[in-house]
From Swiss-Prot:
Record organism: Bacillus cereus
Protein name: Probable spore germination protein GerPA
Family as reported in the entry's similarity comment: Belongs to the GerPA/GerPF family.
Flavoprotein as UniProt keyword: no
Induction cue: Expression is sigma K-dependent and negatively regulated by GerE.
The entry's keywords: Germination, Sporulation
Task of the protein: Required for the formation of functionally normal spores. Could be involved in the establishment of normal spore coat structure and/or permeability, which allows the access of germinants to their receptor.
Record-level GO BP terms: sporulation resulting in formation of a cellular spore
Superkingdom in the source lineage: Bacteria
Pfam families linked: gerPA
PANTHER family: SPORE GERMINATION PROTEIN GERPA-RELATED, SPORE GERMINATION PROTEIN-LIKE PROTEIN YDZR-RELATED
Length: 73
């Protein structure tokens, strides 16, 4: 449906974000990433204590594509 839109101020849009005004048939944001992390990674919270004396992240990813995403460039 048509609408009158007033002033718009865009502060920030992330890399996989969508800004949309008006009618739309489909919105399909596409994003993919790969992360390798060892022990003690991705910890959140207050007063996190992690003791990892011997830790190694071994990465042997021999395939080229993990999962094909249709529509990606």
């Amino acid at each position: 449906m048509p609408a009158m839109v007033g002033h718009i101020r865009i502060v920030n849009i992330g890399s996989s974000g969508i800004f949309h005004i008006g009618d739309v048939f489909a919105i399909r944001p596409i994003s993919y990433s790969r992360a390798f992390a060892g022990a003690g990674s991705f910890n959140v919270g207050d007063n996190v204590s992690v003791y990892n004396y011997q830790s190694a992240t071994t990465v042997n990813d021999s395939d080229v594509v993990d999962q094909a995403i249709i529509g990606s460039t």
